[in-house]
């Protein structure tokens, strides 16, 4: 019997074999912990992070979904400053639901195309 974490890691590796980011269309990777949410835009060919945002520095207390939406807005703004308009969305083995969905929707509303 596999745990939730083992299941997520299996899905993550299965998806990562298919999804790769380039300089023209980098990969937007989401990591979700119990308290925080982190988003990176990565060029896999050069192995560099082009933009990153997280909920670590946020001081105001908000529900987790609202925090995720703010992080999505921040990453969209940073991506546009770096000249990135289209990305490949990597949900990192998480279900496209809840905080992961909020990040994606906020990034789309901020101007990123998936």
UniProtKB/Swiss-Prot annotation:
Biological process annotations from GO: translation
The keyword RNA-binding is assigned to this record: yes
Any Pfam family hit: Ribosomal_L18p
Keyword rRNA-binding attached: yes
GO CC annotation: cytosolic large ribosomal subunit
One Gene Ontology MF term: structural constituent of ribosome
Top-rank lineage group of the source organism: Bacteria
Membership in a protein family: Belongs to the universal ribosomal protein uL18 family.
NCBIfam families per the UniProt record, alphabetical: L18_bact
Subunit structure, as described in the record: Part of the 50S ribosomal subunit; part of the 5S rRNA/L5/L18/L25 subcomplex. Contacts the 5S and 23S rRNAs.
Protein name, per record: Large ribosomal subunit protein uL18
Organism in which the protein naturally occurs: Bacteroides fragilis (strain ATCC 25285 / DSM 2151 / CCUG 4856 / JCM 11019 / LMG 10263 / NCTC 9343 / Onslow / VPI 2553 / EN-2)
Gene for this chain: rplR
């Amino acid at each position: 019997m596999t745990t939730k974490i083992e299941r997520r890691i299996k899905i993550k590796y299965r998806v990562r074999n298919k999804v790769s980011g380039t300089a023209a269309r980098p990969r937007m990777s989401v990591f979700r912990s119990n308290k925080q949410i982190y988003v990176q835009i990565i060029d896999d060919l050069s192995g560099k992070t082009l933009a990153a945002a997280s909920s670590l520095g946020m001081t105001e207390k908000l529900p987790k979904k609202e925090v995720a939406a703010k992080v999505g807005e921040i990453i969209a703004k940073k991506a546009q400053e770096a000249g990135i308009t289209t990305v490949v969305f990597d949900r990192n083995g998480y279900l496209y639901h809840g905080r992961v969905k909020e990040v994606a929707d906020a990034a789309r509303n901020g101007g990123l195309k998936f």
